């Protein structure tokens, strides 16, 4: 409980920084889970640079983009009713999710040194499956998130659920 209270105080004092650092930390954790539990690399074969890249993407891309998106979404649909939550989820999943994945996957490919041609081929191969998999998890999570969770906690809630999603994304993005 003391850790949670400290997190809440930090979030109140420095909301943007804490949200971005939370996203980065949990993206890094997702990659560790991907490498150790999904890919079963073992500690000797663990690619620390890859984990650092994913954590950096969390801080430099995921945290700012998703955190900013939630602010925009709350301005576009300011209410907190069930209908408002449904509208937010539909806009999030119908508009934002495809755009986010369409940027995230090639960004990882670029950071991994893929050529533009290879990156495009990888995006065409991986995007449909990643988007379909997204729709198995995120609509229900986001509906609850938009209805039950205050704006300043949404990114943290999503990133906690996203540890598993990040493991999947890391595996998908690093699979050649």
Curated annotation (Swiss-Prot):
Its main location: mitochondrion. The keyword Membrane applies. One of its GO terms (molecular function) is channel activity. The chain crosses the membrane at residues 18-38, 53-73, 94-114, 131-151. GO terms for biological process: regulation of mitochondrial DNA metabolic process. It is a multi-pass membrane protein. It is found in: Mitochondrion inner membrane. Keywords: Membrane, Mitochondrion, Mitochondrion inner membrane, Transmembrane, Transmembrane helix. InterPro entries: Mpv17_PMP22. It comes from the Eukaryota. The keyword Chaperone does not apply. The record marks 92 as: Determines ion selectivity. GO terms for cellular component: cytoplasm; mitochondrial inner membrane; mitochondrion. Belongs to the peroxisomal membrane protein PXMP2/4 family. PANTHER family: PEROXISOMAL MEMBRANE PROTEIN 2, PXMP2 MPV17, PROTEIN MPV17. Non-selective channel that modulates the membrane potential under normal conditions and oxidative stress, and is involved in mitochondrial homeostasis. Involved in mitochondrial deoxynucleoside triphosphates (dNTP) pool homeostasis and mitochondrial DNA (mtDNA) maintenance. May be involved in the regulation of reactive oxygen species metabolism and the control of oxidative phosphorylation. This is Mitochondrial inner membrane protein Mpv17. It comes from Bos taurus. The gene is MPV17.
């Amino acid at each position: 409980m003391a850790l949670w209270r400290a997190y809440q105080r930090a979030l109140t004092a420095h909301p943007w920084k804490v949200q971005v650092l939370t996203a980065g930390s949990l993206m890094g954790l997702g990659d560790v889970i991907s490498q150790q539990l999904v890919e079963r690399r073992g500690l000797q074969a663990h690619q620390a640079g890859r984990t650092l890249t994913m954590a950096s993407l969390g801080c430099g891309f995921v945290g700012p983009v998703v955190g900013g998106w939630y602010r925009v979404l709350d301005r576009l649909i300011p209410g907190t009713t069930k209908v408002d939550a449904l509208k937010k989820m539909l806009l999030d999943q119908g508009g934002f999710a495809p755009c986010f994945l369409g940027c995230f996957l090639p960004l990882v490919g670029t950071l991994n040194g893929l050529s533009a041609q290879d990156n495009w081929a990888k995006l065409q191969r991986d995007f449909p499956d990643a988007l379909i998999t997204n729709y198995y998890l995120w609509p229900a999570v986001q509906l609850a998130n938009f209805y039950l969770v205050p704006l300043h906690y949404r990114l943290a809630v999503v990133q906690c659920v996203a540890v598993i999603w990040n493991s999947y994304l890391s595996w998908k993005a690093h699979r050649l």
